[in-house]
Amino acid sequence: MKTTCNLRTRRAILSLAAAMAILPLGASAAEAQLLNVSYDVARELYKEINPAFIAEWKKNTGETITINQSHGGSSKQARSVADGLEASVVTMNQANDIDMLADRGVVAAGWAKKFPHNAAPFYSTMIFLVRKGNPKQIKTWDDLAKPGTKVVIPNPKTAGNGRYTYLAAWGSVIKKGGTEAQARELVARIFKNVPVLDGGGRAATTTFTQRDIGDALVTFESEVQMVRSEFGGNFEVVYPAVSILAESPVAVVDKVVDKRGVRKQATAYLNFLYSDAGQTIGAKHFLRPRSETVAKKFAGNYKPIALFTVDEVFGGWKQAQKKHFDDGGEFDKIYQVK
């Protein structure tokens, strides 16, 4: 019996030693993992941001970290997080989506004060992409409303850039002294020209560039410039005289990071977006950086354009959401008429 017990003990020890040998030296049983739930056209940005942060974190702390990405229409993504998708951080394209998460108690009520610039490390605006030669001579928001013009815009109910496009068109009328009725009439005529409402910004880009639907695509400046750099001379970029400031806000998802013990890593990840390295990567992807130094370096990427804010014209995102995008709001009335 003693011999049998000794053999069993020795085998158990050898098995344990073999299992330990498989692990790399210094490996942690619970390597930190983050999930970044983000908007549709930010895929390429975070594919470059993530390895840069991982390398810096490893260099500074000696810890290995894994970052996963999830992308879709901004509002749809936010609802997924509200419904239980365990995001460590959210990186959206409108404050309204994160406000909704704050109202649900998923992120802190004061999330916009946790990071600089109202927790928006980058910003963009809404411009037009047209086909080579601009055959429909689309130069202004009013041109998008001309009969016979087809405009590709993602659904404002699910996509942040769809909402920004709607608000930019509406605000373009108000900024030149027009009335609410005139703004509504212009937006209604533009959406009458929309052949299909895609669920997200990248789907809208695919509809325009690969399915050859539409005379103009309205989307973020960063997406327009990306398409131009990828597809070369097939398309042209058009800047309207005025457009909307489109910020890209971020937040830590408090319940998840505390549950998983990764608050430190999640906070550092979002702070990295404000670093020179993070700002430079954003600028390379045609987002407008907050850093003046980086902005000067990439000044050639951006054309000057008059910008107005959601607060300035609509009284803030909560009022804009309630009036225009809630069920039964202005958008529903306009699109049902279509």
Language model features with spans:
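N-terminal segment of the mature folded domain
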Residues: 31-159, 306, 335-338
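Short beta-strand->loop
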Residues: 37-39, 130-132, 150-176, 190-194, ...
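Short helix-loop capping/hinge motifs at secondary-structure junctions, enriched
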Residues: 133-139, 158, 171-179, 256-264
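A bilobed periplasmic-binding-protein/Venus flytrap-type ligand-binding module shared by bacterial periplasmic
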Residues: 125-134, 247-264, 281-285
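Twin-arginine (Tat) signal peptide motif
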Residues: 2-14, 19
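Extracellular/periplasmic juxtamembrane helices and adjacent flexible linkers that interface
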Residues: 257-338
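Ligand-binding pocket segment of bilobal, Venus flytrap-like solute-binding proteins
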Residues: 176-241
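Sec/Tat signal peptide C-region and signal peptidase I cleavage site
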Residues: 25-31
